Swiss-Prot record:
Gene coding for it: SFH5
Biological-process GO terms, alphabetical: Golgi to plasma membrane protein transport; phosphatidylinositol metabolic process; regulation of establishment of cell polarity; regulation of exocytosis
Protein name: Phosphatidylinositol transfer protein SFH5
GO molecular function, one term: metal ion binding
Record-annotated CRAL-TRIO domain positions: 120-285
Keyword annotations: Cytoplasm, Endoplasmic reticulum, Heme, Iron, Lipid transport, Membrane, Metal-binding, Microsome, Transport
Source species: Candida albicans (strain SC5314 / ATCC MYA-2876) (Yeast)
Amino acid sequence: MSSSIEEVKATIKSVKLTDSQAEKLSKLIDSLPKILSGLDNPEYDEIFGYRINTKDKPYVDESIRNEILLKFLAADDYNLELSEKRLIDSLNWRNEFQPLSAAFEETFDKELNELGVITNFPNSNLKITTWNLYGNLKNPKKIFEKFGANNKVSKLPGSQFLRWRVGLMEKSLQLIDFTSTTDNRIAQVHDYNNVSMFKIDPGMKKATKEIITIFGANYPELLSTKFFINVPLIMGWVFTFFKTIRVITEATLKKFQVLNHGNLSESFNPDELPKVYGGKVEKSLFDIDVSDDIKLSEYGEVILKKVGDEEINHINDDVE
């Protein structure tokens, strides 16, 4: 049964849709059976922990599903053909990469624990933020190697750094409200304190490009602002690099704020922000990190169990 324009409009709370936009979203929703049937794995229908399927299926939250689909539409300026392709490619990527596993099952090099933090500031305009602390990257070559120690993880694509970074993003998305007008995106802070341009590992440059490409393709319309702080003037090449690799849209570039200091008190509530970033809080970022407390959505748990069961069956088949 097709979704009417008014029915679709009623499910979207984050923005006010025009009739034309609602019609495009309605068509994308109606295309879901066709899209899913053409996937590498038609059973994989999860994005950001939510089920992207017809509303008669269990675990489908129609409002959140539609808000997520709307982000895919908006990312391609409501071009239905491009949005369908983006959705197909993203579902296929998620099936192969297993980002929920990266976020909630895998363990990484201890050094990565010092490299990223997620904060939840309920009284700030920017509530959910991921922090990337590049100055703490002590052993880049090790980080950028492929997994090898864990048999399960070694079969999944990506370096430790890439899988960890995707996992951090996935965790942060469990905290946003897709139906909110103000809290349906996250902020990112990239802190370059103590980073020398002479210490930038070639693997880090490669990983940066890979992350930008993956995030641009699979995490549409989820970024409110990206801060680059404590950036030495001599590191201007970093941002020239972003432009020259041409994997970032102009709209995304406009969300970048580059600062040669670390004072973020104008963007975050000082009462929630650590002193090192211009706030009033005595604690460090790591003291207020919420990443270990984040719970995966119900359907995300279902998907992880399903993938795990399939893996066990494959192992049993191989043994037999």
